[in-house]
């Protein structure tokens, strides 16, 4: 089972206009209720790849009820811990002609310590029964900052694969807990760790720093720019595809889904990188969020350049041959 943890889900009310006139009344939008949150995006993209996942989240109030109904409408499996605070929500306004998306978020919910304790209790049992656990998205309050490090420690205890894709004040504690893999945007790392990462040398030093913390795979994406990844102490530079970007929302989550797809299918590291990078690019080329077709990924993934930095791995062809 693929288990996905989302501490801060998002109820989106999406308004799509042909074109927006700023400072004026804009009418006749196409409206849609949408289940958001980084982990939910990962789950949606995995479903497009034919992989079933199970979501575990906080949910509260009227917004939480509407969010859960949206999950049911998408046939995304989930369970939740109820909160007294409302699930956060956002208005997402799209101007199609201008290719502009604007998002307006509410404040994050305050999660009570009793709700955190209940979440952790159930999390222990769920991690025991999964193959891989993904911790995705932000922590909504100080009380929830301990959940992801705790979950990573559980995954290590039960010998499960863990992927950490979070940011904020708790990120250092998450890294110190030693997840199997980490995905982060480079700007998030710089902000969370207060590191001065200016060039390839400093990025390589940081990747080696994480490797010595027993983190096996690291992905430091950087929007549409070249980025770096590591597989143990082997480091790669990746050149993403040049695309016309519409909305990059969910591209990081689609990337994570691509990495999970590669792990489940036992793909070579470089192949999984190409697949994940192509998925992220295709996501950014549409106003949809994490809804990329696998056939489209397969068509373009080999156009992604993956270049080794430093020592190179040797690929052994062990396919059967006639004697």
Regions found by a protein language model. Name each.
Residues 146-233:
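Conserved phosphate/ATP/ADP-binding segment of small-molecule kinases
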Residues 1-21:
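Positively charged, low-complexity intrinsically disordered leader regions
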């Amino acid at each position: 089972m693929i288990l996905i943890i989302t501490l801060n889900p998002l109820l989106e009310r999406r308004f799509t206009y042909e074109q927006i006139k700023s400072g004026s009344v804009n009418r006749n939008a196409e409206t849609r209720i949408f289940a958001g949150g980084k982990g939910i995006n990962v789950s949606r993209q995995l479903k497009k790849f034919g992989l079933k996942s199970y979501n575990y989240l906080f949910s509260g109030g009227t917004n939480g009820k509407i969010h859960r109904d949206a999950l049911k409408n998408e046939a995304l499996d989930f369970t939740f811990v109820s909160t007294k605070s409302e699930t956060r929500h956002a208005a997402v306004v799209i101007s199609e002609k201008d290719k502009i998306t604007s998002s307006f978020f509410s404040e994050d919910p305050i999660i009570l310590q009793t709700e955190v304790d209940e979440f952790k209790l159930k999390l222990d049992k769920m991690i025991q029964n999964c193959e891989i656990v993904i911790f995705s998205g932000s922590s909504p309050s100080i009380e929830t900052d301990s959940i992801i490090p705790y979950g990573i420690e559980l995954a290590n205890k039960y010998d499960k694969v863990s992927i950490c894709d979070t940011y904020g004040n708790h990120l250092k504690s998450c890294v110190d807990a030693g997840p199997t893999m980490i995905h982060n945007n480079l700007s998030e790392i710089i902000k969370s760790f207060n590191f001065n990462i200016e060039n390839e040398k400093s990025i390589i030093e940081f990747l080696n720093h994480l490797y010595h913390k027993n983190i096996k795979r690291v992905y430091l994406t950087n929007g549409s720019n070249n980025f770096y990844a590591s597989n143990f102490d082997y480091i790669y530079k990746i050149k993403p595809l040049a695309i016309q970007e519409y909305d990059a929302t969910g591209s990081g989550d689609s990337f994570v889904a691509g990495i999970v797809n590669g792990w489940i299918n036992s793909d070579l590291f470089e192949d999984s990188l190409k697949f994940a990078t192509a998925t992220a690019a295709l996501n950014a080329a549409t106003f949809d969020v994490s809804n990329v077709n696998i056939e489209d990924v397969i068509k373009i993934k080999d156009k992604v350049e993956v270049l080794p930095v430093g020592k190179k791995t040797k690929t052994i062809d062990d396919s059967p041959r006639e004697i």
